[in-house]
C-alpha cells in the first residue's frame, strides 16, 4: 500500500506533500526504521518518541505519526491528539483489516487469561479450526512463534501478527486481552467475535488508580462485541451481571457454585488431575481433566463453552480433547514429581497465589508442609504485597525473595511483604537462586515446594540490568547438584 492510499480518509491532520510512495512498515522503534517506514512517535513514561523523529528520518522514514506537529521535520507528518487511536487506524488499514477475516476470541480477567487462551486454542485445533494465539508466553502465528514480552501487543505489532495469521490460513485468533491494552487503545481496530471473562480481583491499581477503573477497563472488551457475538462469563463472579449488561452479544455463563449454562459438579481431585461432571442443558457428562486445581476447572469450562458455541463442536468430542490437554509453561508446572514434588507457577496476584497454594496444600500427605518461594515485582501495585504474605501464611512456610525488583530496592519490597506476616513462619533470602536452594534444602519427602511469581519467564529485571534467570532451570540445577 502506498502512503497516499493509506492516508486517504484517515482522521488526522496531514502536513507536507503526500506522494504515492510505497509504505514498507509501521514501527515505534526508531532503531528499526528503514526506508519506506512510518515512524510512530509515541510519548512514553521514560522516553518521548518525538525526540527520535530526526533519527527515524535519517534512517529512511517517509512519514511521522505524532500527537504534535514539528515544523522542523522534512517528511510528511500525520498528527492526532489521540495517537493510540491513530496508530490503530493506520495499522489496521495498512494490513487490510485482518481481524475481519478471523474469528477473534478475546480473553480478559485478572488471572487465568493465559491458560484459558491456551485451552481454547487446543480445543479449536482439535476441532480442525486452526487458530493463532496472542499472549503472555508467546504469540503463535502459524509455524512462526514470537516472544516479545507483551500480553497485548501495541497496535502496529498486533495488526501485523493478525495479518500473518490470515496469510497462514488460520481461521481464528485467541487473544489475551489485558486491561492496560484496552485503556491504551491497542485493540481499537480489532473486531471481536467472542469475549471471555475469567475473574476480577485486585491488580494493576498502580496503572488504573482504583478497582472501579480496573473493572471499567475490562468492560471495554464486552462493549465492543457485536449482537452476533458471544459473551462468555464466569457466572460465579459477583460482577458477572455488570459484564452481561454491558454487551449486546449472546450471554453464555459457566461456573461451579451457581447455576450456569456450563456447570461443573461433583469435583474429585488427585495429584494427577481433576474429575467432575459437566452439566449442560440438564445432561450430565463425566469429564477428566489432567490438570490440578479448582481454578483449572473454571479454565476448562470457559474453553469448552467457547469451542462448543462457536465451533458448533460436539460436546463429547470436546470432553475427550479436554482429557488430554496440557497446561501452558509455568502454570502449576511440575518440575519434579517424586517425593517432595516441586512446582513453578506464574502466580503474582493474591488471588492466583491463593488458588495454587490451596490446590497444592490439599495434596499434602499427613505431616507434610507447603514451602512457598515468592516475592513481588517492583514498580507495580504495592497494595498487594502485604496480602501476598497473608495468603502464603495460611497455607505453609514462606521463603521471601526477589521477583523482578525493577527500579525499587529489593530489600524494601521484601520489608513491605513481611509486614503482612502475623507469625514468624517465614525466612528471607534476597537472592532468588539462594532462596530456591534454601527451600529445597529444608524440604522433606512429605513436603511440596512451590516457586511462585515468574513461571515461564527466563529473566530477572533489576534497576540497571536484566539477567538470565529461569526458575525451572535453577530448580533442576539445584537438584542435580544434590544427586
Swiss-Prot record:
Superkingdom in the source lineage: Bacteria
Keyword terms of this UniProt record: ATP-binding, Cell cycle, Cell division, Cell shape, Cell wall biogenesis/degradation, Cytoplasm, Ligase, Magnesium, Nucleotide-binding, Peptidoglycan synthesis
Motif Meso-diaminopimelate recognition motif positions after renumbering to this chain: 403-406
InterPro entries from the UniProt entry: Mur-like_cat_sf, Mur_ligase_C, Mur_ligase_C_dom_sf, Mur_ligase_cen, Mur_ligase_N, MurE/MurF_N, UDP-N-AcMur-Glu-dNH2Pim_ligase
Enzyme class: ligase
Residues at which meso-2,6-diaminopimelate binds: 380, 403-406, 453, 457
Protein residues bound to UDP-N-acetyl-alpha-D-muramoyl-L-alanyl-D-glutamate: 30, 151-152, 178, 186
Needed co-factor(s): Mg(2+)
Gene3D superfamilies: Mur ligase, C-terminal domain, Mur-like, catalytic domain, MurE/MurF, N-terminal domain
Record-annotated disulphide pairs: none
Chief localization: cytoplasm
Modification N6-carboxylysine occurs at: 218
Protein's UniProt keywords contain Lipid metabolism: no
Pfam families linked to this entry: Mur_ligase (PF01225), Mur_ligase_C (PF02875), Mur_ligase_M (PF08245)
Localization terms from the record: Cytoplasm
GO MF term set: ATP binding; magnesium ion binding; UDP-N-acetylmuramoylalanyl-D-glutamate-2,6-diaminopimelate ligase activity
EC number of this enzyme: 6.3.2.13
Pathway assigned in UniProt: Cell wall biogenesis; peptidoglycan biosynthesis
Family that this chain belongs to: Belongs to the MurCDEF family. MurE subfamily.
Primary role: Catalyzes the addition of meso-diaminopimelic acid to the nucleotide precursor UDP-N-acetylmuramoyl-L-alanyl-D-glutamate (UMAG) in the biosynthesis of bacterial cell-wall peptidoglycan.
NCBIfam families associated with the record: murE, PRK00139.1-4
Protein name per its UniProtKB record: UDP-N-acetylmuramoyl-L-alanyl-D-glutamate--2,6-diaminopimelate ligase
Amino acid at each position: 500500500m502506498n502512503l497516499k492510499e493509506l492516508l486517504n480518509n484517515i482522521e488526522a491532520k496531514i502536513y507536507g506533500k503526500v506522494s504515492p510512495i510505497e509504505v514498507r512498515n509501521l514501527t515505534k522503534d526508531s532503531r528499526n526504521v528503514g526506508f519506506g517506514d512510518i515512524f510512530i512517535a509515541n510519548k512514553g513514561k521514560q522516553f518521548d518518541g518525538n525526540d527520535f523523529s530526526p533519527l527515524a528520518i535519517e534512517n529512511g522514514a517517509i512519514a511521522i505519526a505524532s500527537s504534535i506537529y514539528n515544523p522542523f521535520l522534512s517528511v510528511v507528518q500525520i498528527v492526532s491528539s489521540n495517537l493510540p487511536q491513530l496508530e490503530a487506524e493506520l495499522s489496521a488499514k495498512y494490513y487490510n483489516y485482518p481481524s475481519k477475516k478471523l474469528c477473534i476470541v478475546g480473553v480478559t480477567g485478572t488471572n487465568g487469561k493465559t491458560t484459558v487462551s491456551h485451552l481454547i486454542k487446543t480445543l479449536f485445533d482439535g476441532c480442525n479450526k486452526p487458530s493463532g494465539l496472542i499472549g503472555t508466553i508467546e504469540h503463535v502465528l502459524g509455524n512462526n512463534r514470537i516472544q516479545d514480552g507483551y500480553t497485548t501487543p501495541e497496535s502496529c505489532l498486533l495488526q501485523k501478527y493478525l495479518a500473518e495469521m490470515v496469510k497462514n490460513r488460520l481461521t481464528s485468533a485467541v487473544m489475551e486481552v489485558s486491561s492496560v491494552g484496552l485503556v491504551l487503545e491497542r485493540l481499537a481496530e480489532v473486531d471481536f467475535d467472542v469475549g471471555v471473562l475469567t475473574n476480577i480481583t485486585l491488580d494493576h491499581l498502580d496503572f488504573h488508580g482504583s478497582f472501579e477503573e480496573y473493572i471499567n477497563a475490562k468492560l471495554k472488551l464486552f462493549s465492543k462485541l457485536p449482537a452476533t457475538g458471544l459473551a462468555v462469563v464466569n457466572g460465579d463472579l459477583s460482577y458477572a451481571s455488570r459484564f452481561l449488561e454491558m454487551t449486546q452479544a449472546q450471554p453464555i455463563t459457566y461456573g461451579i457454585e451457581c447455576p450456569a449454562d456450563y456447570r461443573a459438579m461433583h469435583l474429585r481431585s488427585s495429584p494427577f488431575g481433576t474429575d467432575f461432571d459437566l452439566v449442560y442443558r440438564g445432561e450430565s457428562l463425566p469429564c477428566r481433566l489432567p490438570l490440578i486445581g479448582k481454578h483449572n476447572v473454571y479454565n476448562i469450562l470457559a474453553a469448552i463453552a467457547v469451542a462448543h458455541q462457536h465451533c458448533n463442536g460436539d460436546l463429547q468430542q470436546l470432553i475427550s480433547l479436554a482429557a488430554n490437554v496440557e497446561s501452558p509453561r509455568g502454570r502449576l508446572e511440575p518440575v519434579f514429581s517424586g517425593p517432595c514434588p516441586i512446582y513453578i507457577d506464574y502466580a503474582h496476584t493474591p488471588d492466583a497465589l491463593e488458588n495454587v497454594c490451596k490446590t497444592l496444600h490439599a495434596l499434602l500427605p499427613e505431616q507434610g508442609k507447603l514451602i512457598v518461594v515468592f516475592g513481588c515485582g517492583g514498580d507495580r501495585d504495592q497494595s498487594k504485597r502485604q496480602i501476598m504474605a497473608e495468603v502464603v501464611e495460611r497455607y505453609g512456610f514462606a521463603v521471601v525473595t526477589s521477583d523482578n525488583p525493577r527500579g525499587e530496592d529489593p530489600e524494601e519490597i521484601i520489608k513491605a511483604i513481611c509486614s503482612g506476616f502475623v507469625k514468624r513462619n517465614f525466612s528471607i533470602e534476597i537472592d532468588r537462586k539462594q532462596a530456591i536452594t534454601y527451600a529445597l534444602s529444608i524440604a522433606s519427602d512429605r513436603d511440596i515446594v512451590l516457586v511462585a511469581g515468574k513461571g515461564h519467564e527466563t529473566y530477572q529485571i533489576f534497576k540497571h540490568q536484566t539477567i538470565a534467570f529461569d526458575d525451572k532451570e535453577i530448580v533442576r540445577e539445584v537438584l542435580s547438584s544434590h544427586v
